[in-house]
Amino acid sequence: MMIFRALIAAATLAIAIATTLPAAADEVAVKMLNSGPGGMMVFDPALVRLKPGDSIKFLPTDKGHNVETIKGMAPDGADYVKTTVGQEAVVKFDKEGVYGFKCAPHYMMGMVALVVVGDKRDNLEAAKSVQHNKLTQKRLDPLFAQIQ
C-alpha cells in the first residue's frame, strides 16, 4: 500500500511539473535561394507564422545572401536584424506583430519575406505603407493578402 501511495504521489508531481513548464519554442528553417518557389532570389518560405519566443534559422543555401529588417516593417521595440552575407543566423522573435525582411544584396530583385508573430497585427498597416520598388511590391502584396 505504501508503494502504491508513493507511485500516486510521484505521478501527481510529474503531472504538476509538466503542466507548469513553458512549452519549448519552435525553430523554423528559412532558406535563402538564388532560385526557388516564386522565382529568382527568394526566401523559402516567404511567409512564416510564429508564436512569441519562436526562432527562425536563416540558411544561405545559395551563398551571397543575408537577412536585414526592412525599415518601418517591424513592431515598435523589436530588435533590428542585420546578418553577415553568406552566414547562417538564428533570430528569436519575442514581440508580436508583422516583420518584413530583405536580402540586402538582392532587395531590388524582390528578395523579401514576411514573418507574423502571435495574433497582434498592430503594425500591419504601417508595414504595408512602406514604399518598395515594383518587383518587391509585387512579391509582398500576395504575402500581405495572406495575413489579413
Curated annotation (Swiss-Prot):
Binding site for Cu cation: H65, C103, H106, M111
Gene3D superfamilies: Cupredoxins - blue copper proteins (2.60.40.420)
Localisation per UniProt entry: Periplasm
Database matches in Pfam families: Copper-bind
GO cellular component labels: periplasmic space
Main location (coarse class): periplasm
Keywords annotated in UniProt: Copper, Electron transport, Metal-binding, Periplasm, Signal, Transport
Record text on cofactor binding: Binds 1 copper ion per subunit.
Cofactor(s) demanded: Cu cation
Residue span, Plastocyanin-like domain: 30-118
GO MF, one example: electron transfer activity
Signal sequence interval, chain numbering: 1-25
Domain of life: Bacteria
Name listed for the protein in its UniProt record: Pseudoazurin
